[in-house]
């Protein structure tokens, strides 16, 4: 994965060298004023998200149609491209980061290393979570914040109150800023609830929401602690999220004890 994205990927689910950082400098006050005045529509969010994702797709290894990862995601996600009135698209990044993210234009990107750890139902739970962020317009907030940070290098433009076209360099900076943005814990909890309801609506195993979060909790410890726990710091506690899913499943009469949840020793296909 390109250096600009390595430590920034924390908008999704629920870093290994220094990413290129954005130096806001004296532009910060202009950005603040610009953010107050900026008329940022849903169409603006979709347009800028699409441009950012296209930039990321060009700068990251995307699996091709013959890849087992692509075939697996097609099998799981293909039927949900028009979920809940949304127009969604998806791809797999063949990278060692453990994550997934969604954007305001309906783009969902899943990382191969995450797929290696999750069962089909757990991946569907994560996909449902990401769809929830799009449906709840959390991703609109993220792209607006990212745009303001990228435009900060042009203080006059940032303060003008109008969304302007960005250069290729600024698009890269916006992609970095968008992925570095963090949803609030309330937004994450709402997306968790959406994921559970998504699983229930389609007849999937809702217990997978619980087991996915249990795996996230395991990933927050041990050798992965420094990078993964930092990424998850803005999210509600994974154990608490798992327990919330369990309570919903018990209430709905859908709980089946999965036994001890562990991380797989070999990639799940």
Please report, for each region that a protein language model flagged, where it lies by residue.
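Positively charged n-region of N-terminal signal peptides that target proteins for export
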Residues: 1-4
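Short helix-onset patch at the extreme N-terminus, typifying the N->h transition
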Residues: 6-8
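Hydrophobic h-region of N-terminal signal peptides that target proteins for export
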Residues: 10-17
């Amino acid at each position: 994965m390109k250096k600009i994205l390595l430590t920034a990927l924390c908008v999704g689910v629920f870093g290994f060298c220094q990413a290129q950082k954005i130096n806001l400098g004296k532009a910060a006050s202009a950005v603040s004023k610009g953010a107050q005045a900026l008329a940022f529509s849903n169409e603006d969010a979709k347009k800028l998200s699409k441009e950012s994702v296209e930039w990321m797709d060009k700068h990251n290894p995307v699996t091709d149609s013959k890849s087992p990862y692509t075939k697996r995601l097609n099998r799981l996600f293909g039927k949900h491209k028009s979920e809940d009135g949304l127009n969604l698209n998806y791809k797999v990044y063949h990278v060692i980061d453990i994550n997934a993210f969604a954007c305001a234009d309906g783009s969902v990107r899943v990382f191969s290393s995450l797929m290696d750890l999750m069962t089909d139902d757990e991946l569907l739970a994560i996909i449902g979570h990401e769809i929830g962020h799009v449906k709840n317009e959390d991703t609109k907030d993220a792209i607006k914040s990212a745009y303001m940070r990228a435009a900060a290098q042009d203080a006059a433009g940032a303060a003008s109150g109008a969304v302007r076209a960005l250069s290729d360099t600024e698009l890269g900076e916006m992609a970095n800023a968008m992925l570095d943005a963090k949803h609030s814990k309330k937004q994450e909890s709402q997306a968790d609830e959406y994921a559970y309801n998504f699983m229930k609506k389609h007849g999937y195993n809702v217990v997978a929401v619980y087991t996915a979060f249990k795996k996230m909790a395991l990933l927050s410890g041990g050798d992965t602690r420094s990078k993964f726990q930092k990424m998850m710091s803005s999210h509600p506690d994974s154990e608490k999220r798992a327990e919330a899913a369990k309570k919903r499943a018990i209430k709905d009469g859908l709980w089946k004890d999965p036994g001890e949840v562990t991380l797989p020793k070999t990639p799940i296909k």
